Amino acid sequence: MESCYVVWSSYFLQLKLTAPILLKPREIRCLRTGLSILSQQSTFVCMCRDEGSFTAAYFTYIDLRDCGNVTLAVQNISDVDLDLKQFPLIINLFAFFLPSINLVSLPVQIVERMEHNYIPHGECRAQFILYGSQTKLRAHIKRIRWTELQHEEPTHYMYACEFWIDLQTTPPDQIFNSAKVEFISSRNVYFKQIMLHEKILVIRASYENNYLLNPDNFPSDIFFQVNFIQTIPHIVMERNQEPVMTYDGTCITVGSTKNINSNTTDPFSCTFPTFFDSKQKFAGLFIPRLINGISLNTFTWKERTHLQVTMRAYKKNCRIDYSQELGKLIFLPSQIVTHDQSNIDFGWTETSRILISNQNNQISVFRSETTPVADSPVLSTVPNITAATNVSINLNSLHLNIAKEHLVPVRYRMRTDNLRTFLPITALPHTLTVLEGNIGLQTVPCPSGNRDINA
């Protein structure tokens, strides 16, 4: 017999779920819901525990690769057994719209002074090709002198070099403000900074390699091609942080700067020596990835401050690998981020509340924990809330209030087996829907989170 599904669209979805599951004190479980999210471009779906829930849930995002069957990570943070039949799990789902932000990760920095004690490299063949608003540089650098640096990860070599390229007959104003690396002959070489001083183009590069996996050493010469483009950026990074920070056009994926073996007594952190400048138009929001045994902090990243991700282990012998994905950085309009505090709390402790404004602009908190939950699953809307109702979600520890206009509706799909549906027919997305009852939560192994950001 063919399965039937209900498909609906909503700005906010509250899950209020019961199950014959008993959580021991401090126990963590991952529960598969059977709920699907239909793929939508430029949509960033998040889940956060409602402040009325006795059971904690991890504040995280739902990767598009995991949308086929949404999995919830839950924890009993009390010192007594917690029965999900008596104390429902309450989680709020919502989605940010991620516009295409012109983020320049490798800007051309104009400098007035340079240290002149560098000895020129043996040979540097360079060709500049001008294409109107673009300039292409093809170069072959020989006999590179690398300087060894201390890598944060002991199993990695790290070397740095700086080479100077004479612009020859190329006018300096043809070296535009944004650089895009089209290829480098060595895959372990990354360009960190590009500077322009009078008629000299200075490129700072790094080479890093895991000597346990690859015995190759740094190259003595490299070929590369860089395209210089004139652009009006929304956000400019101070320096390129590849391979541990990569931008896909909508958000930055943040990876670990070292291998980490968990210690349950002390927090540990990864530091990224870069900052961003948006002329005070944007602020970053770091949302952690679910990693079994590790809790990461969630925080807002203010411009012109260095990025630091702090973690705490709640299990022994958990491992995070170098460049393993830690979370995502999305950029929000700076007027949303009004609180001065930047490093906030860990993913397990963040809570949320849904706020509703009535016609008189009086704000009330949507309190669903006060209503009993039937065992049979029900999908419904909330009375008196329409498409015109002002609804927002508050992330309590982050001090962020996110209005509906900064969010996008999400399309969900659920099998209709034993599911009673009370959704009015409308051409517009619903503002707030509630899925409650026993939907057949299944315990599954928690993901290790071991996903390399460059895989």
UniProtKB/Swiss-Prot annotation:
InterPro entries the UniProt entry points to: Herpes_UL82/UL83 (IPR008649)
Highest taxon listed in the record's lineage: Viruses
UniProt-listed Pfam families: Herpes_UL82_83
Protein family per UniProt: Belongs to the herpesviridae UL82 family.
Record-given protein name: Protein U54
Organism annotation: Human herpesvirus 7 (strain JI)
Gene that produces this protein: U54
